[in-house]
């Protein structure tokens, strides 16, 4: 699911990566909010706060909020920058490096977060926004913009459009394609919710260390992909 791109990518691959990453995003969203009371998987709310602070001419606070937006953007930029570099050198590592980077960030905050909450909570928010920017950019690139996992606004918009199209498109081939797309979006929404609920439950017991669980899920996803590809290559040789 991490290794296929373009014409070799199937709906099954998109479903696999959407399930994995949307669960992690939901978990990060809740853990980030519980720990530092900040939204860490999207920037829509932060932009509203930025405009509000700028309108009140509290430019220091406006700059502070703008940093949240910047770190999400920076994560998206760095993620695709890595993808472009490795696509020209080692294609087999195109998506591995950004995913490992995200896993390391989540693990790092999971380990140091208890200390940072009291000393520098903004560093937690910046790091998680950066990681989620990386994830959203990565999954958008992998799936050719079919899948986005870190926020739900676009998902509900696309799903609303597709539901309305069901009433007008009578062609069975097109209708089948719409239904598959709607199912994919419903799964992403459900697993984002499941990740959030899991994050909330684990947070009551483990606090910000819950992010270690998110990091582990990403690494297990990479391991599964690696083992599956090796098995397929081995079968071809036999």
Question: Model-predicted segments: where are they?
Answer:
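Alpha-helical transmembrane segments of multi-pass membrane proteins
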Residues: 2-238
């Amino acid at each position: 699911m991490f290794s296929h791109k373009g014409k070799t990518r199937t709906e099954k691959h998109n479903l696999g990566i959407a399930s994995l990453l949307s669960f992690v995003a939901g978990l990060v969203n809740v853990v980030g909010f519980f720990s530092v009371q900040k939204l860490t998987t999207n920037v829509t709310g932060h932009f509203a706060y930025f405009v509000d602070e700028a309108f009140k001419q509290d430019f220091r606070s406006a700059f502070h909020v703008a940093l949240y937006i910047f770190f999400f953007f920076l994560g998206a930029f760095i993620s695709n920058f890595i993808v472009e570099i490795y696509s020209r050198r080692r294609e087999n590592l195109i998506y591995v490096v950004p995913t490992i980077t995200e896993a390391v960030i989540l693990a790092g905050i999971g380990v140091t977060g208890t200390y940072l909450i009291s000393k520098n909570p903004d560093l937690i928010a910046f790091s998680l926004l950066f990681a989620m920017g990386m994830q959203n950019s990565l999954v958008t690139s992998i799936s050719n913009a079919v899948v986005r996992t870190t926020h739900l606004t676009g998902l509900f918009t696309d799903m609303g459009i597709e539901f309305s199209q069901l009433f007008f498109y009578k062609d069975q081939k097109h209708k089948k394609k719409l239904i598959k797309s709607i199912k994919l979006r419903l799964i992403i929404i459900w697993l984002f919710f499941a990740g959030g609920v899991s994050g909330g439950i684990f947070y009551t017991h483990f606090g910000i260390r819950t992010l270690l669980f998110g990091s582990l899920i990403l690494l297990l996803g990479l391991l599964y992909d690696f083992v599956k590809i090796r098995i397929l290559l081995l079968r071809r040789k036999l």
